[in-house]
Swiss-Prot record:
Family: Belongs to the DNA photolyase class-1 family.
UniProt keyword tRNA-binding present: no
Top-level taxon of the source organism: Eukaryota
Annotated Photolyase/cryptochrome alpha/beta domain residues: 23-166
Gene name per UniProt: cry
Entry protein name: Putative cryptochrome DASH, mitochondrial
Length: 745
């Protein structure tokens, strides 16, 4: 009898049996791999999961509860932990159905692999190889290196397989070196298109008995103490959820009329059921129009959590769409649009999947810069050549700038309210409460939450990224962190700090009847006027009394009040929030009300993250948007360079009375041209009131009420869109731009 030769497959974020290159290779008789046994193992890693739920009473967890670096939040909260445990158990069940199994373990990866190798060797089982799939992330790369090092010292073959859960395989992008990856998504997209023809074929599910045998149970070493591995899915869920379920002190009650928009169970089985439902219900076809919804399970695909854990691959989603579009998938025969080719909805889903690919490639290109406060961009220089070194407000007293206002202690209080959803900004609070209750919130609100923290409050954006890491059920390291950078203005958004959302205007645009805010912030449900729903401090004393909100902190001390007129025209506000002259301190974050449409980034249809046209591009994630025909724009000249010890930045509002045009900008980044200033790279400013933006970012045409037609104005973005300036009394909207926050396709 030939001696046993085992291959250990250490699984991480590829929790699926189908379209799995390793399972496919091992089940293919032609591969001639030479292994008699396969031991798939999933390890709950100590550096990301609180393992105290695996420890029996009377014993102690040898590993401290993993916390985030900036905010000190749990690395994995209850919603993702539950989804992950369900996904692991679903894979275990699927493997059992074809004659194999999945070993579940807890602890540091290297310790678990070493224990398995040494234990199998003691039972005279030869471990021929350890295989893993490559994943992005500093911790993930560290796991790969430590396991590879152990294998090398032990004389065991180690192989790192490509991660193939994305839409376009790395070898099919045409990019030979990561430095060649464009820093603008649209440039990358144009290199890849047509998307429908680029995705590789999927790999089938291994047939029963096709995989190498699972080792006899008495040959497999036991879990190292003090951890005990649960024997049922329910027990496994409890083990990972129990240590982190009380993540917020004084968690508000779940609103009576609210329901989760993400009630889905984890695992490959549920993922494919979800895809079929979306196609058959018309959700894929209507996706382009529905994706900005706020309530319910079907306004977006809700496939992002499955993609994040590798329960399904992007190319599996793509080929399901192809089967629907071409009419070859008989199970989709009753779906609207079956056999009629691709449509705007399916095209948009593919674009979202490509954005997810792009975020991962950016992570590969920039590495650990993904987690640095200065982001991908690092140091910026303005058009005059002067280095701009802006910092961020922080709750960390050891790195806060001297004289920081608000103080670190006050920032800590603001963050607590931001996390709990009591800022007084209705859309922000509703999103944060939905998140803490369900682990999910829409792409639209994610964009606004990120912009509110980073742009309006100028608080270190990493607090928000870490909060999302803890709570999002669909957290993905590349998508989450790259998109937070995108919104914060330190990532690869060409508009950088200039892209700012006005959460009041966004609420009027996307929560038109206030249903979303009323659902998740029931305290404001009794208000009749939407402006009171979206900002309770605007309500009259009588209405506050009726609503029972007299003395409520959201009314008496809103974190960031924003004055906004219903006609979407700017109010005349003399106070300038966060205004800082050179060498002076910044005002308190709760000080003055911000001018109305203040640098609103309003998303509409069309556009792309860089403003150069294209589909309604994704986020997770996933982030900003542009003007909606209102005379509201933002200008950026210098950007800002942040470090962990810096903070803040100059920001003020300027009201141009003649044009009734609102500008919000950071730094001295534009100059007013009285008789027609220099415009963007595409043309000259027109009649009176033209502006010259630094680096030629925006050329705003003259002729708005006072000057005839202005050539080359009209708000051309980098000169790309530079139409003739508006007639007197008119204004041009900026090219509409949208980008999703946490990729949701």
């Amino acid at each position: 009898m030939a001696p046993s030769k085992v291959v250990i497959y250490a699984m991480r974020r590829e929790l699926r049996l189908s379209d799995n290159p390793i399972f496919h290779h091992l089940s293919n008789p032609e591969s001639k791999h030479g292994f008699s046994h396969l031991l798939p193992v999933y390890v709950f890693p100590a550096q990301q999961i609180d393992l105290s739920g695996f420890v029996p009473k009377g014993s102690e967890n040898p590993h401290p509860a993993p916390k985030s670096a900036v905010g000190g939040y749990a690395r994995c909260g209850p919603y993702r932990a539950k989804f992950l445990a369900e996904s692991v158990w679903d894979l275990k069940t699927s493997l059992q159905s074809i004659g194999s199994d999945l070993l579940v373990r807890a602890g540091p990866y290297k310790d678990v692999i070493q224990s398995l190798v040494e234990g199998l060797k003691a039972k005279e089982c030869q471990v021929g190889a350890v295989w893993m799939t490559s994943h992005e992330g500093s911790e993930e790369k560290s796991e790969e290196k430590t396991v590879a090092s152990f294998c090398a010292k032990s004389g065991i073959d180690f192989k790192l397989w490509d991660d193939e859960k994305y839409l376009i395989h790395d070898r099919d992008t045409g990019i030979t070196h990561l430095n060649d990856l464009p820093d603008v998504f649209t440039t990358y997209r144009k290199q890849i298109e047509p998307l429908r023809e680029k995705a590789r074929k999927t790999l089938p599910v291994p047939e029963k008995g096709a995989l190498p045998a699972y080792p006899d149970i008495d040959m497999i070493p036991s879990q190292q103490p003090p951890f005990n591995i649960p024997g049922t899915c329910e027990e496994l869920v409890d083990a990972v959820v129990r240590p982190v379920k009380n993540f917020l002190k004084d968690l508000p009650d779940f609103p009576e009329k609210a329901e989760s928009s993400h009630p889905f169970r984890g695992g490959e089985t549920s993922a494919h059921k979800r895809i079929d439902h979306l196609v058959l219900s018309g959700g894929m076809k209507s996706y382009k129009d529905s994706r900005n919804g706020l309530l319910g399970p079907d306004f977006s695909t809700k496939l992002s959590a499955y993609l994040a854990q590798g329960c399904v691959t992007a190319r599996q989603i793509h080929h399901a769409l192809v089967a629907y579009e071409d009419g070859t998938g008989t199970k989709y025969k009753g779906a609207d649009g079956f056999g009629e080719g691709d449509n705007q909805g399916t095209e948009t889903v593919r674009m979202e999947l490509l954005w997810r690919d792009y975020m991962r490639l950016c992570h590969q290109k920039y590495g650990d810069k993904l987690f640095r406060v200065e982001g991908f961009n690092g140091k910026h220089t303005d058009y005059e050549g002067e280095d701009k070194k802006y910092g961020w407000r922080t709750a960390n007293t050891s790195i806060a700038l001297p004289g920081q206002e608000p103080t670190p202690e006050k920032v800590s209080e603001i963050l607590a309210r931001f996390n709990a959803g009591t800022t007084g900004m209705g859309l922000i609070d509703a999103s944060q409460r939905e998140l803490i209750h369900t682990g999910y919130t829409s792409n639209r609100t994610r964009q606004n939450v990120a912009s509110f923290l980073a742009k309006h409050l100028e608080i270190d954006w990493r607090y928000g990224a870490e909060w999302y890491e803890m709570l999002l059920v669909d957290y993905d390291v590349s998508s989450n962190w790259a998109n937070w950078q995108y919104v914060a203005g330190v990532g690869n958004d060409p508009r950088g700090a200039a892209r700012i959302f006005n959460p009041v205007k966004q609420a009027f645009d996307y929560d038109k009847d206030g249903t979303y805010v009323r659902t998740w912030v029931p305290e404001v449900a009794k208000f009749e006027n939407l402006e009171n729903v979206f900002q309770a401090w605007t309500a009259s004393k009588e209405d506050l009394k009726t609503a029972g909100l007299e003395g409520n902190i959201m009314v008496t001390d809103p974190v960031k009040p924003i004055k906004f007129n219903l006609d979407h025209k700017p109010s005349k506000v003399k106070k300038r929030p966060f205004f800082r002259k050179r060498g002076t301190k910044t005002r308190d974050a709760q000080g003055s009300a911000e001018s109305p449409g203040s640098s609103d980034s309003h998303s509409g249809s069309g556009g792309s993250p860089d403003g150069s046209g294209g589909g309604n591009i994704p986020s997770e994630s996933n982030c900003a948007a542009a003007g909606s025909g209102q005379a509201q724009q933002t200008h950026q000249g210098s950007g800002r360079s942040q470090s962990s010890s810096n903070h803040g930045g100059r920001s003020h509002s300027h009201q141009h009375n003649q044009q009734n045009y609102h500008h919000s900008h950071r730094g001295n980044d534009y100059t007013r041209g009285g008789g027609g200033g220099r415009g963007g790279r595409g043309g000259r400013g027109g009649g009176g009131g033209g502006y010259s933006a630094s680096q030629g970012y925006y050329g705003i045409g003259g002729g708005y009420r006072g000057g005839g037609r202005g050539r080359g104005g009209g708000g051309g973005f980098r000169g790309r869109y530079a139409p003739t300036g508006g007639l007197g009394g008119h204004h041009h909207s900026e090219q509409q731009v949208a980008s999703q926050f946490q990729t949701d396709a």
